[in-house]
Amino acid sequence: MVVGMQKKVLTEQALYFGDVSMPKDWEIDQNDLAHHILHSSLTNKKLQFSKTWDKLNTYMREHIGLEYGIQLINKETWGNIYKPTETTIPLLNINPVDLRNSPDYTLLYGVRVDNCFVKIHYDDNRHKGRSWDIPLLNNRFIMFPSTNMYYLINNQKDSLNFVQTITYESF
């Protein structure tokens, strides 16, 4: 029998973000990743496997697993190129009528970015339609539940921004 006041957390919505801190001589080759994103965009084909992408993906899966106990399985991956001053339409990486086969997490990685922000929308109980802005920087990641709508804002006027997206299922 439990006596006194109790608390049970029914749901939690966590965002993970930070640097991709690879060991010396194993750093992510930003130019190689940008090249693959550009090639995929120009040929209108899926992003091809590369050692650089594999290093990034392995790092993320292993570190999220070790730090937070979340085991990740790849669902999909693609790269995007954003024009200067471009703001995307609201993005959602789930299929609302097929949640069972939708990803659990979305990861955004700054391949070659300058003055780029991600606006992530969320609800906080009865406080609906809230959002959080976080800068997306070179060699940094942002990972959040795929049920969150988001969009990217490219604030600068001089260059393209390259962003790698990976979606994951957790188990």
Model-derived segments and spans:
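Catalytic core of non-heme Fe(II) oxygenases with the double-stranded beta-helix
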Residues: 73, 78-155, 160-162
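Non-heme Fe(II)/2-oxoglutarate
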Residues: 1-78, 88
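Generic serine detector
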Residues: 21, 40-41, 50, 102, ...
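Double-stranded beta-helix
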Residues: 165-171
